[in-house]
């Protein structure tokens, strides 16, 4: 099969996991996009806002690895459906926030519900796409995180400004229901023939990883012994941490430091997300075509993140944000398409969820 020619089943799977991961980010980032308005309405300080952002990641860190393990044990279809229901329910409850503790608790719960999503989706991609298709598939899949930034910043600040922040959360909570129905009918394990083909395509090192092991302890030991996976976890800790630090704080930074409105900051972040949306599938497709190793290409694009961030931080003219913002979006997100493709490539076929959960724990 040509690496850029996907079957109908592959397209449906990719669309389903793309929308699932997209909505996990829309719900995650809905807080950041309305934070300037919500903080003022509930008299939260900037420090309290930071703690609410951190609450999500505390919950996320608790379930990202167990969620991957669960996806390998009970199937990624079940973990995806459960996460969609949980995220929708918690986001709806966020419209009832009245104080700091309630906000912290709900943000924590949202993180718990979001933890299994990425590992489950990557596991599905690993099952349905061959090694020469995964760069493109993962690049397209990871573009949803950038589109999530664009989407939430297009509507949430506007809805919060004109109809109240509570309405913004309720509107966000409705979105996963349609995707839940789609995933219920489309997300399935591939046929035994396809699964046998994927096993045969796995690299020798990955094929040996954990074969015959049923113990969780032994499976984790095998993952930890894989140098590629350890390096990806360390790289992800620094690169992904910086990416989401920038994304979570950019709206508030522009409002408080540069004096723009919440709607204006949302427009800048929409352009930021759109640029990243284009960059990720592009670099993923190129990684499948160019005679360059994915790890070398990943190192190059990670290096470019630094200058892009310095350029954005040096921007004092609000109009220039529409130029430096997209540049930062490209620099901040391009690496994720490559690193996640490398995760799928490095993992044993039956441990893809666990491996993705382990790497994304960092």
Tell where the protein language model's regions lie, with residue ranges.
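Juxtamembrane intracellular "pre-TM" segments in multi-pass secondary transporters
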Residues: 1-7, 193-232
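Extracytoplasmic
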Residues: 12-46, 246-251
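Extracytoplasmic gate region of multi-pass secondary transporters
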Residues: 31-32, 226-270, 277-280
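Conserved MFS/SLC helix-loop-helix module at the cytosolic interface between two early adjacent transmembrane helices
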Residues: 62-101
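Helix-to-loop junctions at the C-terminal end of transmembrane segments
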Residues: 64-75, 280-292
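Cytoplasmic helix-loop-helix junction between adjacent transmembrane helices
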Residues: 106-147
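Helix-loop-helix hairpin linking two adjacent transmembrane segments in secondary transporters
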Residues: 141-192
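C-terminal transmembrane helical hairpin of 12-TM major facilitator-type secondary transporters
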Residues: 293-342
């Amino acid at each position: 099969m040509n690496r850029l020619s996907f079957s109908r089943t592959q397209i449906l799977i990719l669309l389903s996991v793309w929308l699932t991961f997209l909505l996990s980010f829309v719900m995650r980032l809905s807080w950041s996009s309305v934070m300037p308005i919500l903080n003022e309405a509930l008299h939260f300080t900037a420090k309290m806002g930071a703690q609410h952002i951190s609450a999500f990641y505390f919950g996320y860190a608790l379930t990202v690895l167990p969620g991957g393990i669960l996806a390998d044990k009970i199937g990624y279809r079940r973990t995806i459906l459960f996460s969609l229901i949980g995220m929708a329910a918690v986001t709806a409850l966020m419209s009832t926030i009245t104080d700091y503790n309630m906000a912290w608790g709900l943000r924590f719960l949202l993180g718990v519900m979001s933890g299994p999503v990425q590992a489950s989706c990557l596991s599905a991609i690993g099952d349905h796409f061959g090694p020469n298709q995964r760069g493109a598939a993962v690049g397209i899949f990871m573009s949803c995180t950038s589109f999530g930034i664009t989407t939430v910043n297009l509507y949430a600040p506007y809805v919060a400004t004109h109809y109240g922040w509570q309405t913004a959360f309720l509107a966000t909570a409705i979105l996963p229901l349609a995707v839940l129905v789609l995933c219920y009918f489309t997300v399935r394990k591939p046929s035994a023939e396809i699964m046998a083909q994927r096993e045969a395509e796995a690299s020798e090192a990955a094929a040996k990883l954990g074969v015959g092991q049923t113990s969780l302890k032994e499976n984790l030991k095998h993952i930890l012994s894989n140098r590629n996976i350890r390096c990806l976890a360390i790289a992800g800790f620094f690169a992904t941490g910086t990416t989401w630090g920038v994304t979570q704080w950019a709206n508030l930074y522009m409002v408080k430091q540069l004096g723009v409105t919440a709607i204006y900051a949302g427009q800048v972040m929409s352009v930021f997300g759109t640029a990243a949306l284009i960059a990720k599938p592009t670099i993923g497709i190129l990684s499948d075509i160019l005679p360059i190793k994915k790890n070398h290409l990943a190192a190059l694009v990670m290096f470019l993140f630094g200058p892009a961030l310095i350029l954005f931080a040096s921007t004092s003219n609000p109009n220039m944000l529409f130029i430096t913002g997209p540049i930062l979006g490209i620099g901040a997100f391009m690496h994720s398409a490559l690193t996640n493709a490398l995760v799928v490539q490095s993992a044993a076929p039956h441990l893809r969820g666990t491996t993705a959960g382990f790497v994304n724990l960092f």
